Regions:
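Polytopic transmembrane helical bundles with strong interfacial aromatic enrichment
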Residues: 1-122
Length: 122
């Protein structure tokens, strides 16, 4: 994936995160339990944070930074995506997918750290 495409993906995911945050605050607040709403908000928070991390990875550039961005993308899909589906459908087994997204996030941060060290030493 090119840096430009990765940057665009990060920006789109941030925009979707803002939209989902507004949806949760206005449309779901009266329909969900406090626990489910908190779970939805966690999904939005992690999506926003990692969308920004994707933007940073795209700006840093290099193969490792792009890999980090892809890991963040996978993390958003698995972590936030599974939580959104869990909250909206009530299908409990989706919670088993969430930790895989967390692992992708952790790996992404590690790879981004290596990419940053390499870029700053150059």
């Amino acid at each position: 994936m090119s840096r430009a495409t990765l940057f665009a993906v990060g920006a789109v995911l941030a925009g979707i995160g803002v939209t989902l945050g507004a949806f949760g605050a206005h449309a779901l607040e009266a329909r969900l339990t406090a626990e489910r709403l908190a779970t939805f908000e966690t999904a939005v928070r992690y999506q926003m944070l990692h969308a920004l991390a994707i933007l940073a990875a795209a700006l840093l550039g290099g193969e490792r930074a792009v890999l980090a961005g892809l890991l963040f993308l996978v993390g958003i899909a698995l972590f936030s995506g599974s939580l959104y589906l869990l909250v909206l459908t009530g299908v409990r087994w989706l919670g088993a997918i969430t930790p895989l997204g967390g692992v992708a996030f952790i790996a992404g941060w590690g790879v981004l750290a290596l990419a940053g060290l390499r870029a700053l030493r150059a």
